[in-house]
Structures are given as C-alpha cells and as structure tokens.
Amino acid sequence: PSKTRNMVRRSLKDCDIRIISNIELIEDNGYDVLDKAYIRYKDKNCNPISRSTWEEAIRNDLKSEFWGVYIKETGKLIAYSKNSIGGLRVNYASMKSIPEYMNKHYPNYGLLYEMTRYYLKERKYRYVTDGYRSITEHSGIQDFLIKRFLFRKAYCRLTIYYKWWFGIAVRLLYPF
C-alpha cells in the first residue's frame, strides 16, 4: 500500500537501521526502549523484567540476531528487534519501540522493511514469521503486519492433552 511505502521511505530517511551486537543493544540503552514500549500495551498487568535480568539475558543470548533503529540526527536508539533463526525461517521474536517516536520517524516500518528485505532477498530464507499470537494480544503486531506488510495468518492444529480424569470430564461436557 502507498501509505506504507511513504512511511517506510520516511523511516529510511530519518533513521539508521542496522544489525547490532547484543552488547551494543545493552550499551545503547535497549532496556529504556523495552521499558517505554510497555506503556502502549493494552494489558496493564504486563510489566517488563528488571534491567539486570534483561541485561543478563541479552548478554548471554549468542544465538539471536539483533537489529537497532537509531535516529540519524542524534544517534539515539528508538527501536530494536531480537530475531531467532532456525532452518529456513527467521522468527521476529521480540520487537520494541519507544511510543513517542512511532508517529514521527516510523521506526517499525523501516525496521520491518529492512529485516524482511535482508532475510528474504539477501540471505535467501524461505519465510519470516512474527511467531505465535499471544493470548493477551497486548501489542497488536499481527494485525499491523497483515494490514501494512501483507503478512498472512498460517493456522496450525492445536492438540491438547489432559490428565486422564479431566479428559473424560471434557469429553462428557463437550462431545465434539
């Protein structure tokens, strides 16, 4: 869509979007991005982990690839993504951005465009995914990807295993 193209262009003009190391993410105050991102979440019971726990997890994560979005004028980190790679796919495992910059610099548009271009065109992965829809759906990222970047839903079969006695109760109450 043309509106999406304009927002991507604006983001690429205003922002520097690149792969960064886990240490760069910590040093460039990635935790502040995480902390401020939680402000926009619909589920107010959702709170970020502590800074020390987050930094330890990021420092020890040597398997993921990290991307950062920096404002060109100031060099400030305003968004980041943590991606896990497995086989022929890339999972955009966690994307965070500071809400106050979202409607001025459109960091998510540029970030998604650059990551998708890089992984699908340059690195030749078969597909990218944003993972599974959460029960709380606190961020709305799936709807954003479907509407703006023409992602699609890929449904999967869910198999639930119960304790034997609970399974009997479920089958009696819901015979489907």
Task: Specify the residue positions occupied by each region the protein language model found.
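A conserved beta-strand-loop-helix scaffold within acyl/acetyltransferase catalytic domains
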Residues: 1-104, 118-119
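Short low-complexity, flexible loop/linker segments enriched in glycine and/or proline
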Residues: 35-36, 144, 168-171
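Aromatic (often tryptophan-rich) hydrophobic motifs at membrane interfaces
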Residues: 63-167
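Acidic/histidine-enriched, glycine/proline-rich intrinsically disordered or flexible terminal extensions
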Residues: 172-176
